[in-house]
């Protein structure tokens, strides 16, 4: 890997770390899945029949918002939250890059082992 490729990989990892950190919580993942399945909802709707308090939901949504996964909009006294699918696509693309890197590394290992065992 060239110095340029190493620098690019480091920058991508630096950019991706907050995204994966935001996804590293069960409650936040549940909120994302809920918004994906049901569409935009208020905090009041999300807290109905939930063991999580409105305050906790608000804090989790703020983390997701800071990472770009959701956006909120005031409608009167309510704050309506919606999923931002592009950010999910960004994470998917990052995971694809990581998978390709592993595929290449495994291919190099396979080639090395086969060359080492050649007569």
Please tell me what each predicted stretch does:
Residues 84, 88-112:
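C-terminal structural segments of small proteins and small subunits
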Residues 12, 107, 111-119:
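Short, charged, intrinsically disordered terminal tails
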Residues 61-62:
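Short, hydrophobic-biased segments on the C-terminal half of alpha helices
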Residues 2, 6, 10-53, 67, ...:
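N-terminal helix-turn-helix DNA-binding core of bacterial DNA-binding proteins
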